[in-house]
Amino acid sequence: MEAAVRVIARSGVRGLRVEELAAEAEVSTALLYYHFKDRAGLIQRTLAFISDRATGYTDEAVSGTEDARTVLLQLLLSEIQDTDRVRENSIAWGELRASAIFDTELRATLAESTRSWTQDTAEAVSDAQAAGLADLRVSPLDVADRLTALVEGLSERWLSGSLTLERARELLAGAVDAELGPRPE
């Protein structure tokens, strides 16, 4: 699956060829077809892998963090960091999101993955509210939708060279403060 993410990050979804992936993964095309049945199955499984891998590095980012507001911020900032794993994931996610416009099967899978990410983010907002670290008047789901959409947009701008990594992270931190209200003293 890592090879599929690398190929998509390098060549895009439209550039994903089973032969190229087989070479990247050092396996036969027959083995890929055996496991994934077809290109669509491969893309669906790659999306699931991307989501699982993102969960891994977001969990790492909040490990040992006890302040609920900081947990939310670190969850979001972990999606915009200069590591091969995050860069590949972000590029592949953006490619899959763009492809979902034209692919209804992929659209449904991507929508479910997005709902899960948004729900996790909304729960982090609720935790910050329960801890007295966020304005109780804000809707956790609305905040989560806006912040996850912002992460995607900032990530695309950073990856395409329109923003520096530092500026993207600074803007995201500012958005968390704007959404949650001032941090209580």
Please identify what each model-predicted range represents.
Residues A3-G41, R45:
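Helix-turn-helix
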Residues A3-R10, Y57-A61, A92, L96, ...:
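Solvent-exposed, amphipathic alpha-helical segments
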Residues G41-I43, L75-D82, A108-R115:
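A ubiquitous short alpha-helical element
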Residues R45, G56-S90, P140-L147, R169:
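Hydrophobic alpha-helical connector segments
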Residues A48-A54:
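Short, basic, alpha-helical segments at the C-terminal edge of helix-turn-helix-like DNA-binding modules
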Residues V71, D84-R107:
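Amphipathic alpha-helical segments used for helix-helix packing
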Residues D84, E88-I91, E123-D135:
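A surface-exposed regulatory interaction patch that couples sensing to output
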Residues R107-A111, R115, Q129-E179, R183-E185:
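Hydrophobic/aromatic-rich alpha-helical bundle segments in the mid-to-C-terminal region
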